[in-house]
Design a protein with these regions (language model features):
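Short loop/turn segments that flank or connect secondary-structure elements
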Residues: 1-214
Length: 214
């Protein structure tokens, strides 16, 4: 889901000093992606990020087709309300900011959410189908990259910011307990988005930045 936008301060959590914006290839990064910790804790939050927010999950135009192609495999997992919304307006719409996002139910749930009958935990139906080998596509990259938000700039570069959201306080706590930086938690989707070579360069940069902070 897409919550209100936030431009985090480039401030190190270790020494409290401000760090410059970093760059790896054609990607600008807020340094707190390297210095802050995060690890999703579904048992604690119940998957609330798929429910809360003021619009659906941000989409790339090509991802609409992926969602449409995935729909037959996941439709049975969706609520009747979600299926009705999809039948009426499709899997995506343009929100009040003009951004392409997933359709939502009653201003809350992404239409691709499903719930565990025993725990009540909310899951992504497309990711569930992918993990079970029923589809070849996992989920929108904006969902996979969270809590990183990507913004494409007019000069051709991409900008990555660490998005702080109050519903993810349990993930911050768990990340700190594990000592797991945001960029390591998101190794798989970052590699999927920018490539293995890019991620390897990010790891080298992270080692340099974090060494300077010790």
């Amino acid at each position: 889901m897409n919550s209100s936008s936030h431009n985090p301060a480039a401030k190190s959590g270790n020494k409290g000093r401000f760090l410059p914006i970093l760059q790896v290839g054609d990607v600008l990064l807020s340094p707190d992606i390297l210095t802050e910790c995060f690890c999703c804790d579904l048992e604690a939050c119940g998957g609330i990020c798929c429910v809360e927010g003021d619009s659906g999950a941000p989409l790339q135009p090509e991802e609409v087709l992926h969602l449409e192609n995935t729909l037959p495999a996941v439709e049975a997992d969706l609520s009747a309300e979600a299926r009705a919304v999809i039948a009426e307006q499709g899997v995506a719409y343009s929100d009040t900011d003009g951004d392409l996002v997933t359709s939502i139910v009653d201003g809350r749930d992404c239409v691709f959410t499903c719930y565990d009958k025993n725990t009540g935990c909310c899951y992504c139906a497309t990711e569930k189908a992918f993990r079970e080998g029923r589809t070849q596509w996992c989920k929108p990259i904006s969902c996979a990259l969270y809590p990183i938000r990507e913004r494409r700039l007019s000069n051709g570069l991409s900008a990555l910011n660490y998005h702080r959201w109050s519903v993810c306080h349990a993930a911050v706590r768990k990340g700190n307990e594990l000592g797991l930086p945001v960029y390591k938690f998101l190794r798989e989707p970052l590699t999927r988005r920018f490539g293995a070579e890019w991620y390897a360069e990010l790891e080298v940069l992270a080692e340099q930045v974090l060494a300077d902070e010790i």
